[in-house]
Regions:
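Bacterial N-terminal signal peptides that target proteins for export
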Residues: 1-12
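Mature, structured domains of secreted/extracytosolic soluble proteins
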Residues: 23-239
Length: 239
């Protein structure tokens, strides 16, 4: 019993000492984490058109003099030539823009071939000059198919991975349907089999995986593609 009383006294004394010492310590400044990288969306205050036509993604070249493949020189020239600037510039926060980078215009089966009948461009020919010889009806059809009338991120409304989600583009009716599906790593495929679409959409290399994601604009959201996609074959150009 005496041992227990002495132990209690010792604990009490130690507590008083610690309390006294603790009172002499200054309060530490509250730690606030400041990330090195900004977590804000850098394009949230500009429209899709303002981004696509900006110097940030135009008039930049590789060492061999070719346009940087991930930029949008041809896309901005195509939008202007087709008279569709308003579709990319009008306030509307409920759209998804599938942005076709320079790579999507160059090569067999890509946009330049689809709208001019040939993938060839002359030496020194600018994107504006190429689009000046395009079939504008075909060009408008391609661009409208790459605007979806729903705001789509990698997981909203693509909530479940491995599930096909069907959306409507600016082309009305069945021919304007487009299908997106994500995997468990948040990679998103467009019109990839077994999407519930005609084989003209899912086969023959006409499906595509999104390259870069989630460009948040004041009038929607954008994702970039390395190749164009389709539902039905685009008409042959009348050149």
């Amino acid at each position: 019993m005496k041992y227990l009383i002495n132990k209690i006294k010792a604990i009490t004394a130690l507590t008083l000492v610690l309390a006294t010492v603790g009172c002499d310590l200054e309060l530490q400044d509250r730690f606030v984490f400041k990330p090195d990288v900004s977590l804000e969306d850098p394009y949230k205050d500009i429209t899709a058109w303002q981004f696509l036509s900006s110097s940030q993604v135009n008039n930049q070249f590789n060492e061999d003099g070719t346009l940087i493949g991930d930029n949008y020189d041809y896309m901005s020239a195509a939008i202007a030539a087709a008279g569709l600037i308003d579709e990319y510039n009008t306030p509307n926060d409920g759209r998804t823009f599938l942005m076709l980078n320079n790579n999507a215009f160059l090569g067999n089966g890509d946009v330049i071939a689809l709208v001019t009948g040939s993938p060839d461009i002359e030496e020194g020919e600018t994107p504006e000059e190429v689009m000046a010889r395009a079939d504008l009806d075909v060009l408008r059809l391609i661009l409208r198919y790459h605007i979806i009338s729903t705001y789509i991120t990698q997981n909203d409304p693509l909530v479940e991975f491995g599930v096909n989600y069907t959306f409507q583009t600016l082309i009305p009716g069945e021919e304007g349907l487009i299908v997106l599906r994500r995997d468990d790593r948040l990679r998103v495929d467009v019109n990839r089999s077994p999407a519930p679409l005609p084989s003209t959409a899912t086969g023959g290399g006409n499906n595509e995986r999104i390259r870069n994601y989630n460009y948040v604009f004041s009038n929607g959201i954008g994702h970039s593609l390395n190749d164009p996609v389709r539902n039905q074959p685009y008409p042959s150009p009348n050149i």
